[in-house]
């Protein structure tokens, strides 16, 4: 089981906290992150892997997140900015259909 933290930015302590906790329950678990510019994101640099994404307001953002989850065995999404909440809630059923829980 893996976790995805979206719009990771500078949330290094959040990524590290999830890395520590997931290993207790899922030794092979990974914490992935997304950001519009992951090479400049300190949280992306400490994550087990990262993905470049478009802004949440752009077309196909949700489709891309779903594909990332399916391709990388991601079961939980942790959003970190307010603008992600409504699109994630509105698409909660789509995520659930592929076995992903949105933390909203």
Regions found by a protein language model. Name each.
Residues 1-103:
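ATP-binding N-terminal substructure of ATP-dependent carboxylate-amine bond-forming enzymes
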